[in-house]
Amino acid sequence: MKKTVLSGVQTTGALHLGNYLGSIKNWVKMQEEYNCFFFLADLHAITIDIKTSELNNSIMEVLAIYLAAGLNPDKVTIFAQSMVKEHAELSWLLNCVTPLGWLKRMTQFKDKAGSDQCKACLGLFAYPILMAADILIYKADIVPVGEDQKQHLELTRDIAEVINRRFDKEILKVPDILISETGTRIMSLRNGLKKMSKSDIADFSRINLKDSNDLIYQKIKKAKTDHLSFISYDKKTRPEISNLLDIYKSLSKESMEKIINNYQNQGFAKFKEDLAEIIITNLQPIRDKCLELMNDKEYLLKILHKGAEKAKIRASETVNEVKKQFGFII
């Protein structure tokens, strides 16, 4: 029996190269080996202020990118989180067993809320509980995530164990965390110490999956390196050039040693020119297919509804099982 994998991307802002290399590219490989659930995290998206039209378009665009990148809806279950109401229902049940102190330790809330945490919405504070529900509702065996989500996954495991201990039986599967070695943490093109992010106000800090070829060239050409004239890999002392090398390695499948040797006597200009070409070669087919799919909203909606119906079968089973243990009438 195939193991179950679950992951998703929040439907806010434009998806970028970090999303592709850190998540979607790996999912495409996993769909052949696992029973996969890949969702659009639209409920998480409204923890920030987002316009109605922007959210609606973002849901469709993220779905189109999933498909354009190679996810096959006949092999995996693709759905919008909001279309499976059981996510919110299980989230409430988990809220009622999770100690407040656990949530107060979550570093991402502190980062996203900023200095005035009192103005942040409750949804942002409770974000990790909904994330736990997203995972536990499908009894996922494996959850592929970036390093920055590791704390949330550890919380998910703790919550599952609380439920299981409370009712003295394994109701919820305690998932394993999968952090791949390559591509999970692509950094900003302007600051090698910051993760590439949709929320960064500087557009030149990232390569968006829908960027034109010319814009990709410009962004890579202006990507920050350092004062040294040679190419080498050291994330601690040379974070910017190391980040560009990580991108090159992830897209070219060449070893780091070979890449560095190839450009040892050629300098940054030639390296950046070739890197831009590699990025374009990988992203242009995705961009073109995405634009084609966005012109067929009826097809995209059909995929969402089909995926939601399939997801609801397992989700409702889990929620009813948990509710029964609490004592609710099913």
From Swiss-Prot:
- CDD domains this protein is in? TrpRS_core
Which Gene Ontology terms of cellular component type are present? cytoplasm
User: Where does this protein chiefly localize?
Assistant: cytoplasm
Residues involved in L-tryptophan binding: D134
Q: Which UniProt keywords apply?
A: Aminoacyl-tRNA synthetase, ATP-binding, Cytoplasm, Ligase, Nucleotide-binding, Protein biosynthesis
Q: Where is this motif: 'KMSKS' region?
A: 195-199
Cited InterPro entries: aa-tRNA-synth_Ic, Rossmann-like_a/b/a_fold, Trp-tRNA-ligase, Trp-tRNA-ligase_bac-type, Trp-tRNA_synthetase
Top enzyme class of this protein? ligase
Q: Which GO terms describe its biological process?
A: tryptophanyl-tRNA aminoacylation
- The parts of the chain that form a coiled coil are none
Q: Which reaction does it catalyse?
A: tRNA(Trp) + L-tryptophan + ATP = L-tryptophyl-tRNA(Trp) + AMP + diphosphate + H(+)
Supply the EC number(s): 6.1.1.2
Record-listed ATP binding positions: Q10, T11, T12, G18, N19, G146, E147, D148, I186, K195, M196, S197, K198, S199
Single annotated GO MF: ATP binding
Q: Where is this motif: 'HIGH' region?
A: 11-19
Q: Where in the cell is it found?
A: Cytoplasm
- According to its UniProt entry, what is the function of this protein? Catalyzes the attachment of tryptophan to tRNA(Trp).
The record describes its quaternary structure and partners as:
Homodimer.
The record, for HAMAP family, names: Trp_tRNA_synth_B
Please report which protein family the annotation says this sequence is part of: Belongs to the class-I aminoacyl-tRNA synthetase family.
Name assigned to this protein: Tryptophan--tRNA ligase
